Each structure stands twice: as structure tokens, then as C-alpha cells.
């Protein structure tokens, strides 16, 4: 009987630690997604500004540089680590960055996982970075990443030979892509919120 009680106490303590860890990771994911929203909104504002017909090619190039900086910040946020050093969007306990940039293109190389935090209760402690950042409709029936959207905007706005029509088309495509990307991140945050509510019920 004493052994059974000790085992139950040990199991309860382990579950308590697992719940605490899962909560921390999910809160860090929520913070990262919130920062991503801010960065994408800032980029959207710049794209709108770049669409002003009175701007010169030099003005647009300057805006493109700002958008590029925001894009790089977004990549850093997407590779956020949790308190244990694992990547929040990188899969269960991953020590490998989930978002990898090669020759200017960003790819996602992770497999999100779940963790049991209570008897028969599992929550996602590694969020699906692909769904959040890499699955934006491209307007032609395919998918692209939010990084692709920003890269295309930077390229178009940096082109000194771009015509007014080119700029208009590029800014519209960027706004559409960023709006879709913001919706994806918002959905990811909703998922995190649901997981946190599940943890509240376990506690």
C-alpha cells in the first residue's frame, strides 16, 4: 500500500512538472506568434507606403531595405527556442533550427510533436511552423511561405526599372500574401490558446 501511494505521488509530481513545462513552451510560442504578427503588420504598412505613386525608385529601394530587415527578424522569431534550448516550432525537443535559409530561400525542416501532460491528455508542445509561416496561398492555386511573399516584395521594390504598373502589381500581391499570412498566424495562436485551456483543465 505504501509503495502504491509513493508511486502515485511520484506520478503526480512528474505530471505537474510536465504541465508546467508544456505551459511555458506554449506561452513562448504565443509570444513568438504575437511578435510575428507585429512584424508582418509593419511590413504590410511599408508595402502600402511603397505603393504611393509619388515615390521615386530610390524611395522604394529604401522601403525595400526596411522590409528585408523585418523579414530577417521574422525568420529569427520563427526559430525561437524554449527554455530548454529546443526550437518552439522545431518538433519534440528539436535542437535543429526548423526554418533554414539556403541561397536566399527559406525551407521548413521539422516534425511537430505532442506531449502527454496528464493521464490520457496530450497537447502539442511544438507548434506547426509550416502551417503558420509556410502555407500562404499564392493566388495561383499553390502555396508559398510568408518569407517568399516578403522576398518578392523586396525584389520588386528594389528594381529601379520597375514601372508604375509593376509596382502596383507587386504591392497588391504582397498585401494579399501578408493578409493570408496574418490569418495563418492568427489561426496558430488560436491553436495555442486551445492547448493552454486544455492544460488549465488538467491542473
Predicted regions and their residues:
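Amphipathic alpha-helical polymerization modules
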Residues: 1-94, 155-203
Amino acid at each position: 500500500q505504501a509503495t502504491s501511494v509513493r508511486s502515485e505521488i511520484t506520478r503526480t509530481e512528474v505530471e505537474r512538472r510536465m504541465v508546467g513545462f508544456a505551459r511555458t513552451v506554449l506561452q513562448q510560442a504565443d509570444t513568438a506568434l504575437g511578435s510575428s504578427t507585429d512584424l508582418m503588420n509593419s511590413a504590410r504598412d511599408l508595402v502600402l507606403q511603397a505603393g504611393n505613386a509619388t515615390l521615386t525608385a530610390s524611395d522604394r529601394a529604401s522601403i525595400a531595405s526596411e522590409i528585408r530587415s523585418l523579414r530577417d527578424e521574422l525568420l529569427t522569431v520563427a526559430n525561437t527556442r524554449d527554455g530548454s534550448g529546443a526550437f518552439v516550432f522545431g518538433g519534440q525537443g528539436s535542437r535543429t533550427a526548423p526554418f533554414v535559409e539556403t541561397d536566399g530561400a527559406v525551407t521548413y525542416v521539422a516534425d511537430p510533436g505532442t506531449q502527454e501532460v496528464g493521464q490520457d491528455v496530450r497537447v502539442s508542445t511544438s507548434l506547426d511552423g509550416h502551417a503558420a509561416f509556410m502555407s500562404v496561398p499564392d493566388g495561383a492555386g499553390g502555396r508559398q511561405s510568408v518569407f517568399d511573399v516578403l522576398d518578392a516584395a523586396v525584389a520588386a521594390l528594389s528594381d529601379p526599372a520597375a514601372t508604375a504598373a509593376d509596382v502596383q502589381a507587386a504591392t497588391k500581391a504582397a498585401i494579399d500574401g501578408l493578409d493570408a499570412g496574418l490569418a495563418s498566424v492568427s489561426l496558430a495562436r488560436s491553436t495555442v490558446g486551445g492547448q493552454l485551456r486544455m492544460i488549465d483543465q488538467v491542473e
